[in-house]
Amino acid sequence: MGAASGSAVCIANVLNNCMRYDNLDVIEDGYGINLLPLALFASQTYENAERFRPKSVSIDSYSSKDIDLLSKMHKAICIIQFKLEGQLIARHPEFNMGDRDLLSQINFKDMTITIDGTEHYLLDTEFPTVDPEEPTKLTSEEEKLMKKLVHAFMNSEKLQKHIHFLLTSGSMYLCFNDNLLFHGCVPLNEDGSLMEFKLNNALFKGKELFDHCDKIVRRAFSTDQNSSKKAYGQDFLWFLWCGRNSPLFGRDHITTFERYFIAAPETHNEQKNAYYQYYSEEKFCIELLKEFGITNKNAKIVNGHIPVRVRNGEGPLKANGKLVVIDGGFCKAYQSVTGIAGYTMFFSSHGIRISAHQPWCGLEESLKDNTDISSETVIRDNFPERILVGSTDTGKILKENIEELEALLTAYRTGVLPQIYKK
């Protein structure tokens, strides 16, 4: 969404992720975005990019030259990403992320960086576009490249159509039929209290935080192109993606830089928000539902974002059935971790049903062996009493419509509203 709004830093993050996990066909074929300028810039700028070899690239699909070019493109956009993130962090001290401008913390004399008091040697020391005096400043070539990419993303008709659908149909959270749905987490302090965020010179937490985030996101698309509100909304979309304890991210920080440049595995750890220490407790889930105005005894929280590690014995139901985790789905990078290809939750008048899916074997094998995605119902949780239409959100709307129609009919019958007859 941030990329579609024209945010250069979000575009860099999108391209970084697509290259890392070999999803560039989505960008080029799906959305018709031309990456030739990036390829030309990368091939002319970088020599060594072995550390940026795509994580899940298929050797059968690419030649060694293709992989070499992809690696250089990957490195080029990563360096641009780190520069733009450093600039954004400097613009917004209220995000409390000054320690995450890692490019500015590199000691370019001996090519080391100190994190949490420990000095680490960098695994890649080639930085032809980085000025040690101004590490986050883009070169003129990088600026030209990003202008082209911003124009391409903003003028992709299909991408804009898809993001418009998300804006008009989606939200930060949804209360539906006494269920609370959200993607990441409701940020908490270590003691379990709601974490406060200072945004626009005001403090927000819990439901108020989600409501305010929703407003800021929409400003990134609905205001004038060069307005300060739009610029803040674009930066805030990046914060939601990977900002400290963001409700959509739910971690202290993202370790993209460390995974590329530092060997020590302890630096790759992304500490989760305290929410994940409490979301298995039934009492906490009941209180969280109340925070969003839901008190029904059958209410559930439907929580995304965190993969369910089935191979380690984890399951999608937590807190005595008050919370359902539905995530870690069709993303190939997670399937080796989870052991499955995600879950689907079905909600009906009888209760909920959760199906687990096995990874897709691929088009060739499907056609050869006439196989499909294998799914199995793993959980059934029936309600004590069947839910009738009148008790659902749709039923409540129908009741309101009936009351309005009856009031209108009464107004006509009593003469409050005169009927007009056409001759």
What positions do the PLM features span?
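Feature recognizes metal-dependent phosphohydrolase scaffolds
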Residues: 1-423
